[in-house]
Amino acid sequence: YDEFVSALSKHISVIRTEAGCEFIDIYRDTQKENVVNVWEIWSDRPSWDAHMVNENSKAWQSVAKDLVFGETITVMDQLP
């Protein structure tokens, strides 16, 4: 858990510099042990799509594959 959070924190510091990233942070789940949530806000869908396939994200997936035991991605649009 600690190794994962440390690696994720480093990854997030890079994401914060990406075009279109308005907010990203890590939250510890208070009801489920060893579970974290990452909350991201992107300026638009194309920016998020570009983030998901850039070299930094590919490198993260290589690191995370040995540390993550489940992942759910939910994409939401803000209501007017």
Place the predicted regions along the sequence by residue.
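Short hydrophobic/aromatic patches at helix-to-coil boundaries
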Residues: 76-80
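Short beta-strand micro-motifs enriched in acidic
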Residues: 27-31
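An amphipathic, aromatic/His-enriched active-site/gating alpha helix that lines ligand/cofactor pockets
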Residues: 10, 14-22, 41-75
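Residues on conserved beta-strands of the protein kinase catalytic domain
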Residues: 34-36
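A structural signal for the hydrophobic beta-strands that form the central parallel beta-sheet
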Residues: 23-26, 38
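Short, surface-exposed ligand-recognition loops at beta-strand->loop->(often short) alpha-helix junctions
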Residues: 1-4
